[in-house]
Amino acid sequence: FELSEGFFVLDPLGQQEILFEVGGVSNSPMGEGISGVLSEKMFSMNPMAYEVYQEKFAVVREGVARGDSFLLNLTVATGLDTNWTLEEIFHRAQSPYRLLVPGRFVCFSPEIFVRMDEGMISSYPMKGTIDASVPDAERVILEDYKERSEHNTIVDLIRNDLNRVAERVDVKRFRYIDRLRVSRGEILQVSSEVTGRLTGDYYSRLGEIVFGMLPAGSISGAPKPSTLRIITQAERERRGFYTGVFGYFDGKKLDSAVMIRYIEVRDGRYYFRSGGGITINSDCRAEYEEVLAKVYLPFGNERSK
């Protein structure tokens, strides 16, 4: 997230040090299972105290009230009690974008960052999540004023990001629903598709294009520069690889994802990183419950767009 560390693998399919799946392309060995008895596996969380979250939320609300940010993605680390290993989670997770760096973290993201193919660049900002068991859940989230405002802000930010690197930028699909099956049931997530036309020899400047859009708008906020300063003040810890990006380039096409749905190891303990968008209309208790609701294992059928 801070652009201070990264990996560049020259032969991604020919190595096993870092395992990945990006849009159906993977170097993961087949048939990997779990150790022990499935029924004996446990996964529970030790959430941050609400009072601690309140302090972080207050810093963000103050910045929003000053006009320094219209929307800010506030993230937290939730401690886990689990006997799942990072490797087991990676191999069992059903997600279109997976990444495992042994001993450090596992990521199982449903969110595309950018795709580049045949002169087109596409981004798919994801903003808005609801439990599918909520009565009339799709209508509820699509008609929710706060959710709509957040999504509009992020789509506008992504459109501006693409305008810096592409021409004829357009919102091709706006606020469509993905239904995702996770370990505790189903959730609905709201995304949009923003596209643009790349010009010239864009292959020679892929890195410039990608780095010019970082950090991703959906996990930072708008406007970016002042929002990032507030994030540093409120979160009081580095995100590291969490909310960064990873991807695969086959020589013609680039596919990449935002590193959300992320479990890391620190000092022998597991932490699940999650976050949510804060605006002037946000309620602290509701936002706290949302970041905890995002702590799950994707042992269902997550769909790609």
Please name every model-derived segment.
Residues 1-305:
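Extended alpha-helical targeting/anchoring segments
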